[in-house]
Amino acid sequence: MQNKRNQSRVLWLLLIYITIGIFIYVGVNSLIGTPDVSKIEYSELVQMLEDKKIVSLEIEDSGYARARDNRGLYYETYAPTLLSDQQYVYGLANQGIEIKYVRSLENSWWISILTFLLPVFLLIFLFTFLFRSSGGGANQGMNFIKSPAKKYDPKKTRTTFNDVAGVKEAKEELTDVVKFLKDPKVFNRLGARMPKGVLLVGEPGTGKTLLARAVAGEAGVPFFYISGSDFVELFVGVGAARVRDLFNQAKANAPAIIFIDEIDAVGRQRGSGLGGGHDEREQTLNSILVEMDGFDPSIGIIVMAATNRPDVLDKALLRPGRFDKKVVIDRPDAEGRKDILKIHFRGKKIAPDVDLEVLARATPGFVGADLENLVNEAALLAARNGEKFITMKDCEEAIERVIVGPERKTRVLSEQEKEVVAYHELGHAILGTILPNADPVHKVTIIPRGYAALGYTLQLPSEDRYLMNKSEILDDIAVMLAGRAAEEIIFDEITSGAENDLKRATEMARRMVESFGMSEKIGPVAWASESEETFLARELFREKNYSDETAKELDSEVKQIINKSYEKAKSVLLENKEKLQFIAQYLLKKETISGQELRDLLQKDTDDLKEYVENLGVSSTQEEAKVVNYEYLSRENNLIERKGI
């Protein structure tokens, strides 16, 4: 195969060199030996002939004439009369003027043929290059319209439900699909109709692709994998052709599973995009719909698709007879995370102190991909440190690296900046500890990590929860604003470090007013749009469902919630100002303190706390606070990461 490619490459290079050589030859042949020529009128040439100044004359069949005078200068003019008036030319020859007839370059037959064939050769070369680039080899140009789907043989790379954890309900939903693929006749005999399509809906990293492969592995049938973006190419009609080819391959290997990942790339609502109603994406979608209607369900083909944006899919995809079975894959709970960790720790050497239950509780909101990354980071850290086993310390550091990134040891802060960061983070931490509805604090640090965090506070919900009441949300907003409040109280100045806190607090307050109906003035009315995600094609043409007057009231309510929460944060910090100052000195000495340490310090009275901090004398060998628990920014699936600066 490699020799054929090399031979083809040599032939094309040879063709290119020959073409370039012809152009060079023509150009040089037309230029070499041709002196400077002056353009003159025909009447001037006639006058010079009468004055006997011309010694030679070249007449081209194109009508142009080139003359040389007795001084060796050349002249050129358009003189078609010299071609038709032969007696006049004979008379010039009798006067001793050298007459020569030449064929013009433009009328040369081989130049004409070259001019015609060269563009054809170039077009053939261009299209052949494109087809071969897409097809992957010589004589495979038609592969350009063939489906690029990858076929997985369950006998070679088998994935089963034992390799999938944390999605118990989803596996139960897909058990019928497995049974149907194993023996379709059982369902056909009873008159049951299995769904033609199964849509897996879940956030990125929840294991949609892995679950689809597990279904194929359990059933022992071929698995065709393709991404939605693979259908759309430069040339119109390629996507539809690839859809037809994909279904033909599946029918030839039935029973089989067709899995289309990120189907929203081609399955978005038609007529709502910026490309008009007849773009390539819509043709591809139409082809998918036709194919799903056309194949016989009794032959044992199941079309599975995955998306994290079900709100933008075309309704025709979701109607009965197409993707009429929807399986939601949610983030795993603590028990599910423990099972996922067991799978990823298989075959790895772990120390006896590694407690999977503790790690599962320490990672709320983590999806399967996050947990896989966590285990890999822990293994890399153990290898980097020359350890024989993965320890609990490696796992704890890995969690922190996944959430906020590695330590930035090269980022050296000035003493003044360190002090600002310490007070900012303690503002978050003290509010999180004192307010009754806030999530418990588990770590406060002023060690820079990741891209932008100069310090951070980690909180962890005591349990997996799926609802938040109004008091919890208001306390969360107060905690977010407490970093800025602490800066204002201590330094009578504010910094840019609260930018992220302000964004998150404002967003949460707006959701309270517009989505949750938690504003007493506005009442239980939902003003937010249907989708929290931005979809450009919709947003351009969507009209607000409320007036400008209502918009002012909504903004006013959001601002009022923020202001009240900020005043609440300042009030709590002012009541504990002295403790804030002493604990800040403690944090500056230790750089990292645990949530339990912080709670113990806040329980001391002011005098005892002052004496304790002054007599601390932290040495470089003193053991730092051991942190086990980490968290996400809210129960809205964001990291609970108080990035101070």
Swiss-Prot record:
E.C. number(s) listed in UniProt: 3.4.24.-
Listed binding positions for Zn(2+) are 424, 428, 501
Q: Which residues bind ATP?
A: 202-209
Primary localization: membrane
Q: How does it sit in the membrane?
A: Multi-pass membrane protein
| Keyword vocabulary terms for this entry | ATP-binding, Cell inner membrane, Cell membrane, Hydrolase, Membrane, Metal-binding, Metalloprotease, Nucleotide-binding, Protease, Transmembrane, Transmembrane helix, Zinc
Q: What cofactor does this one take?
A: Zn(2+)
Sorted alphabetically, which InterPro entries does this protein's record hold? AAA+_ATPase (IPR003593), AAA_lid_3 (IPR041569), ATPase_AAA_core (IPR003959), ATPase_AAA_CS (IPR003960), FtsH (IPR005936), P-loop_NTPase (IPR027417), Pept_M41_FtsH_extracell (IPR011546), Peptidase_M41 (IPR000642)
* Cofactor binding, per record: Binds 1 zinc ion per subunit.
Q: Main EC class of this protein?
A: hydrolase
* Role summary: Acts as a processive, ATP-dependent zinc metallopeptidase for both cytoplasmic and membrane proteins. Plays a role in the quality control of integral membrane proteins.
Q: What is this protein called?
A: ATP-dependent zinc metalloprotease FtsH 3
- Which lineage is the organism of this entry classified under, starting from the top rank? Bacteria, Thermotogati, Thermotogota, Thermotogae, Petrotogales
Its encoding gene is what?
A: ftsH3
